[in-house]
């Protein structure tokens, strides 16, 4: 799956979303493989370390999978996932602020 904006990429995204909605494990694996590198970079910039970034992306991927039926395709899957990662990262930062470092 590419993110070039071509017709093929749009068709790939539509197929991915259809697979996720059908709860096919291969579709989830594809989503993780294709989008994790970029999302990890976003999460690292937001939370500041690799361990928390991996947690954020994992939480975001599971959240996206569980709520794929809410995806309306007004934007690209990558945009939707980016927003979910940012929200998960902000939640991680809020949680971190509430807990003093031990």
Where are these regions (language model features)?
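Arg/Lys-rich amphipathic alpha helix in sigma70-family domain 2
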Residues: 69-73, 83-102
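Short, charged helix-capping/linker segments at alpha-helix termini
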Residues: 3-5, 21-30, 40-59
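Structural recognition of an alpha-helix C-terminal capping motif at a helix-to-coil junction
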Residues: 55-62, 66, 75-87
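Intrinsic, short, N-terminal disordered tails of RNA polymerase sigma-factor systems
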Residues: 1-22, 26, 30-34, 97-98
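Generic leucine side-chain signal with a strong bias for well-ordered alpha-helical environments
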Residues: 16, 20, 39, 46, ...
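Hydrophobic/aromatic residues within well-ordered alpha-helical segments
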Residues: 31-35, 39, 85
């Amino acid at each position: 799956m590419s993110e070039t904006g071509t017709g093929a990429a749009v068709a790939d995204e539509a197929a991915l979303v259809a697979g996720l909605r059908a709860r096919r494990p291969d579709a989830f694996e594809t989503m993780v493989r294709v989008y994790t590198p970029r999302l990890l970079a976003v999460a690292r910039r937001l939370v500041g370390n690799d361990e928390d970034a991996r947690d954020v992306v994992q939480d975001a991927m599971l959240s996206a999978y569980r709520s794929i039926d809410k995806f309306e395709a007004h934007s690209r899957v990558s945009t939707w996932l980016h927003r979910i990662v940012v929200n998960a990262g902000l939640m991680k930062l809020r949680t971190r602020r509430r807990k003093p470092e031990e």
